[in-house]
C-alpha cells in the first residue's frame, strides 16, 4: 500500500508543483508592470487557490482513472480499459462545464468576498474568468497525463508540462507588456499566456 501511495502521490505532487510555476511566472511579470503592479499581485494572490483547486480536481480525477486503467490493462481487458478512458474524458467534460459556469457567474462574487479594493476586484475577476472559461487545457492535460502514465509513457506527460511552462514564459512578457503587434493587456495578458500554455500541453499529449 505504501509503495502504491508513493507511486501515485509523487507524480501528483510534481504535477501540482509544475502547475504552480504558471502562477509564479505570471506574478514575476505582472510585478514589473508600469501601472497597477501592486494591485495585480494582490489579484493573483487571491486567484491562486482557485487555480490550484482546479489543478487538484483534474489531477485527482486523473489519478483515479490511472489506477483503474492500469488494473484493466494488467488484466488484459482492453475493452473495459477503453471504457474507463472514455468515461474519464466525459467526467473531464463535466468538470470543465462547472469551471465554465463558475467563470461566467461566480468569479466576481468570489473575488469581491476577498477584498474591497475595486482595482484588485477588476484585475482578479478578469484573470480568473479567463482561466476558468478556458480551463479545458489544465483539466484535460491532467487526464491525458494519467492515461499516459497508466500505459507506461510518463515521459510524454513531463515533456508536455515543460512545453506548456516554456510557452507561458515566452508569451507572458509579450502579452502583458505588449511587444511587436501584440497590444499591452496587463493581467489579462498573463491569463491568456497561462491558458495558452495549458492548452498547448494538453494538445501535445492528445496528439
Regions found by a protein language model. Name each.
Residues 21-24, 32-33, 38, 72-75, ...:
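Helix-loop interface residues and adjacent transmembrane-helix termini in multi-pass membrane transporters
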Residues 2-21, 25, 50-57, 133, ...:
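Residue-level signal for short hydrophobic patches within transmembrane helices
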Residues 12, 16, 28, 67, ...:
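Transmembrane alpha-helix boundary and packing residues in multipass membrane permease domains
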Residues 30-52, 119-123, 187-189:
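Interfacial/gating helices of multi-pass transporter permease domains
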Residues 30, 174-189:
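Interfacial helix-loop-helix junctions of multi-pass membrane proteins
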Residues 79, 92, 147-174, 188-195:
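Alpha-helical transmembrane segments of multi-pass membrane transporters/permeases
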Residues 1-9, 69-136, 182-207:
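Short alpha-helical transmembrane segments in multi-pass integral membrane proteins
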Residues 41-101, 138-157:
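Small-residue-rich hydrophobic transmembrane alpha-helices
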Amino acid at each position: 500500500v505504501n509503495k502504491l501511495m508513493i507511486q501515485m502521490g509523487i507524480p501528483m505532487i510534481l504535477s501540482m508543483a509544475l502547475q504552480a510555476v504558471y502562477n509564479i511566472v505570471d506574478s514575476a511579470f505582472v510585478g514589473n508592470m508600469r501601472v497597477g503592479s501592486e494591485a495585480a499581485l494582490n489579484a493573483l494572490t487571491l486567484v491562486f487557490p482557485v487555480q490550484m483547486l482546479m489543478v487538484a480536481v483534474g489531477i485527482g480525477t486523473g489519478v483515479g482513472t490511472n489506477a483503474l486503467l492500469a488494473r484493466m490493462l494488467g488484466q488484459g481487458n482492453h475493452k473495459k480499459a477503453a471504457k474507463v478512458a472514455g468515461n474519464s474524458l466525459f467526467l473531464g467534460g463535466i468538470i470543465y462545464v462547472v469551471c465554465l459556469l463558475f467563470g461566467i457567474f461566480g468569479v466576481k462574487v468570489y473575488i469581491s468576498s476577498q477584498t474591497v479594493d475595486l482595482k484588485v476586484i477588476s484585475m482578479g475577476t478578469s484573470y480568473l474568468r479567463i482561466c476558468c472559461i478556458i480551463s479545458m487545457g489544465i483539466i484535460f492535460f491532467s487526464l491525458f497525463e494519467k492515461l499516459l502514465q497508466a500505459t507506461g509513457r510518463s515521459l510524454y506527460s513531463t515533456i508536455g508540462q515543460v512545453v506548456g511552462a516554456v510557452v507561458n514564459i515566452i508569451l507572458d512578457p509579450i502579452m502583458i507588456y505588449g511587444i511587436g503587434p501584440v497590444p499591452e493587456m496587463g493581467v489579462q495578458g498573463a491569463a491568456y499566456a497561462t491558458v495558452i500554455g495549458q492548452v498547448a500541453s494538453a494538445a501535445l499529449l492528445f496528439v
